[in-house]
Amino acid sequence: MNFVFISPHFPENYWNFCDRLRANGVNVLGIGDAPYETLPALLKSALTEYYRVDNMENYDEMLRAMGFFTFKYGKIDWVESNNEYWLEQDARLRTDFNITTGIKSAEIEKFKRKSVMKTYYQKAGIPTARWCVTADVTEAQAFAKTVGWPVIAKPDNGVGANGTHKFKNKTELNKFFQQEGPSAANYILEEFVDGEIVTFDGVADANAEPIYAASHVTPDSIMEIAHGKKPMWYYVAPEISPELRKMGEAALKAFGAKSRFFHLEFFRLKTAKPSLGNAGDILGLEVNMRPAGGYTVDMLNYAGGLDLYQIWADMVAFGAAHHPLARYHRYCCCAGRHDELRYRMPHEELLKKYRSCLNAAPRLPEVLAREMGDQLYIASFEDEAAMQAFRRDALARPRE
């Protein structure tokens, strides 16, 4: 089996995917823009060959790289980056080289555009917040009048909180439409939801059924975290509620999420709202057909005592898991600190106090630090009370 892994060097933990594929007997070929000599030794040992391109945005270069591998190794069976940024290019390469193990260009829209995602959530019988897409400020005002303030605007094709706006009144909404003009149609307007994000994460088989699934919770608004108003904090829950599992499995079927990682996002309402539901009810938010970002895959591993990189590689090579799934169910949390801020408990003291619970304390590159923090702490706990005590110690600021 020939597997072309796109950008195997970034994110930095993605060498694990290549390593597990190779362990399963897969011929792993890499395409990236990093010089070969800068690749980690563990990645080099997992790759049969690496083709460096000057610019991964240049599709002609990517075609030449794929053509080279096809000529040298025969038909390519898989192309995957497991990276949101390259999903559309992955699909285009599959289309051009007739690779049938993943989604092609004609279908990629449902994995990228939020407005299209809403229709697939509806197909799965999953409620969502009300929304509209328009470049007409009058229509936008009418929508806001219907759903009430505040109103959220997000890029229809985008990920995370990048480019997200929160309008508290008509003046702010009008200013946005004046600035954007016709480009406002590239945004989706949504009613505001007071909820925490809960996810359905895992690996799906060729029938869009989960081989393994877990869930993590982000109590604070992603937009507030991204804008620096709230610290990075989220955790893997030890169990998935029956309602969330039912919705997650229905969404996988509706979206046709076959043979791939999935990261499905839902709102769990903090307060009741007549148009949405009661506190605790779950709404569909958006889908990401790749692993959750940052160190979440590692956190899922720590929480469950498994190797999700290996489970994914088993799916690729064998269509099912050939290695153990979760051996236990713990909380695993991630807290992020920013270098420019002071915290009540110094770094070294935090490391010492929680040395038996800490799984990792990585520094983040600048490209990720703005949203997540410069310094992360990943720790596992048997119970929620111990985890919340860690949160207080990790994130508490000095008293004024």
Describe each region flagged by the PLM:
Residues 94-163:
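A conserved helix-loop-beta module that forms one wall/lid of the active-site cleft
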Residues 127-130, 150-153, 164-199, 221-233, ...:
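Conserved ATP-binding module of the ATP-grasp superfamily
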Residues 121, 144-166, 184-201, 213-217, ...:
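ATP-grasp fold ATP-binding core
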Residues 136, 167-171, 346, 383:
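Alpha-helix N-cap recognition
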Residues 191-257, 261, 268, 272, ...:
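ATP-dependent carboxylate/phosphate-activation module, predominantly the ATP-grasp catalytic core
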Residues 69-76, 145-147, 182-183:
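Glycine-rich phosphate-binding loop signature in dinucleotide/nucleotide-binding domains
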Residues 1-106, 138, 321, 383-399:
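ATP-binding N-terminal substructure of ATP-dependent carboxylate-amine bond-forming enzymes
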Residues 313-400:
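Peripheral (often C-terminal) accessory segments that flank ATP-dependent C-N-forming ligase machineries
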